[in-house]
Amino acid sequence: MAIEPASLDAPFAALAAFDWGGDAKTLAPIDAAVVAAHGDASLTAEVEKRLAAVLGSPAPRAAKQYACRKLSLIGTAASVPALAALLADKDLSHMARFALERYAAPEATTVLRTALGSVEGDLKIGMLSSLAAKRDTASVPAIAALVTGDSAVAVAAAEALGLIAGPEAAAALAAAQTGGAAAEAVVDARLACAEALVKAGRKADARSIYEALSKAVGDAPTTHRGRAVRMACQRGLFATMEG
């Protein structure tokens, strides 16, 4: 049975006032509409428009989080601006990112890149996580610039480059100037890049990373971590010789 737009008026009115502890059954018609929207462009556009409107309204945080979750399932480029407006909101940024990570529209990745340069602290770390989840190679230069010193952001940036992997990320990590936990994160990320390069058939590139890291820890490392890195390099070097 087709869902008529007018039948969504009451459920969306309930959503506009929905808060923690509210009756979730009143939102069931929206849940059903989201499911029915798959394969139905007209219904998708209608539901998406209404969900995006909730994000720009004075609705409670619970209602906006619900809207973000539903947009993560059916959202298109049309609702990217509404989600982008929440990326600097300390209470809703994580839910906006949750949705945008799942968008196929390139506009979603673009707004995450833009937000990376405008937010700080935990919100910046969140953007790094989302860009890594999307394996966004275009963000490598901006992320690489954050891999400096010894801070939580530097650690997160190194981890993001390790997840994005590829030769550009590997080169950025090799040039990183860090210390403490960030330096350890860089080593781990370089190992992740090398593993990804092996899987991509770029064994010579991977081998150069393993050799550099192995040389850095020496033939007889005295710490548990140093020994673990050397062992990982030895396994990696063996993998570059297979096939």
Identify the residue ranges that each predicted region occupies.
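Short, small-residue-enriched loops and turns at beta-alpha junctions
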Residues: 180
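Structural detector for internal amphipathic alpha-helices that build alpha-solenoid repeat scaffolds
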Residues: 2-3, 20-42, 53-56, 62-76, ...
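General marker for long, soluble alpha-helical cores
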Residues: 46-47
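Short N-terminal segments immediately surrounding and downstream of signal-peptide cleavage
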Residues: 4-17
